[in-house]
């Protein structure tokens, strides 16, 4: 099955050498930067190379509806872009919310990391509000009968951590409720996967409406990704909601997908942004895309070596190479021709803060051959 991979910090197409090249005929390719030695060199065949398209966004979620692609991304009231193909041309057409999020915390004007799904004739856009480096966060949801701008209803709070109603319940007492990913199986059961740093990535079941958690969160919550030993030092922030006493665990950006007969849990590991080009993190400490798989959407998920993701496991799918630096923030779009894994990255040597503008990149493979 085709796997197309989209990266962030420019929209590019990444192509595996073992398959025919994806056609970019008729599309204008942006000028590539002058090649300079990569800080973390990889063998030429370690990862696919990239080609750029015309979409510049950050933290997108992409769906395909009746011949049109819709991208939802971080920005004022959650930006919407539309295009006739992944190549583009992409056009910004509006926003999901017609006002600030109704959740009274975090960055209400520009919610983070949205994910949009279609279920039972309704479009659901899940989003997060927070402040960088703190876990006083919340996940909300808006719904609409159409995927484009206009007609969305902000239902507000789904779950939250740090402060507020429900934040004193497990697992919200130790987790950070951002980076929502919702998966709905063929049986209609929905699952919310979320988390960033702190106690890692968690999952709770949703009720039939997808607007509330089903059952008791304390007993139904599953920790899916974690590492016992923190690779980064503890924060000294005076606010207890903004520090991790036992050290930082750079795990976030989960996404759950299904490729028969396996469920795949993708996540980002490492430093995502705010890079100092004169003092980059040691190789392997910057963002990379990792994955595990399971026969159940509830896990446990293991990597190719059989290591549980909840115990430090994770198969590296894509990492820094060529002009790609710190790829992550991934999601999966399922097409008739195959699966599309999209993500963001910084283009080397122009490594800069990822805020709103970033590049979208895609690569192509005939199978999930990273597991072979």
Swiss-Prot record:
Its main location: secreted. Residues 23-52 are annotated as: Disordered. Pathway: Glycan metabolism; L-arabinan degradation. GO terms for biological process: arabinan catabolic process; xylan catabolic process. Glycans are attached at residues 120, 363. CDD domains: GH43_AnAbnA-like. One of its GO terms (molecular function) is arabinan endo-1,5-alpha-L-arabinosidase activity. InterPro entries: GH43_arabinanases, Glyco_hydro_43, Glyco_hydro_43_endo_a_Ara-ase, Glyco_hydro_beta-prop_sf. The active site is at 59 (proton acceptor), 252 (proton donor). Residues 23-34 have a biased composition (Low complexity). It is found in: Secreted. It comes from the Eukaryota. One of its GO terms (cellular component) is extracellular region. It catalyses: Endohydrolysis of (1->5)-alpha-arabinofuranosidic linkages in (1->5)-arabinans. Residues 1-16 form the signal peptide. The record marks 179 as: Important for catalytic activity, responsible for pKa modulation of the active site Glu and correct orientation of both the proton donor and substrate. Keywords: Carbohydrate metabolism, Glycoprotein, Glycosidase, Hydrolase, Polysaccharide degradation, Secreted, Signal, Xylan degradation. Its EC number is 3.2.1.99. Belongs to the glycosyl hydrolase 43 family. Endo-1,5-alpha-L-arabinanase involved in degradation of pectin. Its preferred substrate is linear 1,5-alpha-L-arabinan. This is Probable arabinan endo-1,5-alpha-L-arabinosidase B. It comes from Aspergillus fumigatus (strain ATCC MYA-4609 / CBS 101355 / FGSC A1100 / Af293). The lineage of its organism: Eukaryota, Fungi, Dikarya, Ascomycota, Pezizomycotina. The gene is abnB.
């Amino acid at each position: 099955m085709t796997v197309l991979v989209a990266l962030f910090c420019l929209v590019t197409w990444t192509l595996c050498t073992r398959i025919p090249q994806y056609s970019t005929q008729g599309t204008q390719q942006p000028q590539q930067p002058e090649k300079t030695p990569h800080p973390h060199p990889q063998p030429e065949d370690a990862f696919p190379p990239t080609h750029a398209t015309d979409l510049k966004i950050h933290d997108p979620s992409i769906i395909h509806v009746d011949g049109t692609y819709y991208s939802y991304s971080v920005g004022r009231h959650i930006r919407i872009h539309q295009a006739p193909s992944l190549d583009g041309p992409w056009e910004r057409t509006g926003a999901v919310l017609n006002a600030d999020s109704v959740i009274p915390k975090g960055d209400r004007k520009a919610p983070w990391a949205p994910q949009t799904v279609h279920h039972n004739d309704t479009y659901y856009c899940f989003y997060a509000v927070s402040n960088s480096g703190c876990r006083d966060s919340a996940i909300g949801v808006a719904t609409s009968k159409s995927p484009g701008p206009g007609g969305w209803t902000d239902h507000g709070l789904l779950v939250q951590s740090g402060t507020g109603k429900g934040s004193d319940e497990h697992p919200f007492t130790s987790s950070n409720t951002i980076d929502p990913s919702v998966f709905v199986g063929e049986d209609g059961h929905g699952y919310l996967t979320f988390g960033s740093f702190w106690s890692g990535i968690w999952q709770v079941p949703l009720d039939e409406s997808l607007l509330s958690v089903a059952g008791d969160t304390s007993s139904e919550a599953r920790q899916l990704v974690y590492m016992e030993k923190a690779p980064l030092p503890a924060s000294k922030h005076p606010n207890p909601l903004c520090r991790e006493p036992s050290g930082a665990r750079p795990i976030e950006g989960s996404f759950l997908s299904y490729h028969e007969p396996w469920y795949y849990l993708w996540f980002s590991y490492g430093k995502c942004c705010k890079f100092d080009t004169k003092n980059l993190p040691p190789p392997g400490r910057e963002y990379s895309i990792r994955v595990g798989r399971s026969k159940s959407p509830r896990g446990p998920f293991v990597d190719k070596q059989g290591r549980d993701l909840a115990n430090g496991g994770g198969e590296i799918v894509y990492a820094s190479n060529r002009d790609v630096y710190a790829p992550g923030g991934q999601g999966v779009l399922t097409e008739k021709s195959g699966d599309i894994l999209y993500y963001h990255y910084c283009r080397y040597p122009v490594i800069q803060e990822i805020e709103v503008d970033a590049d979208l990149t895609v690569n192509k493979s005939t199978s999930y051959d990273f597991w072979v």
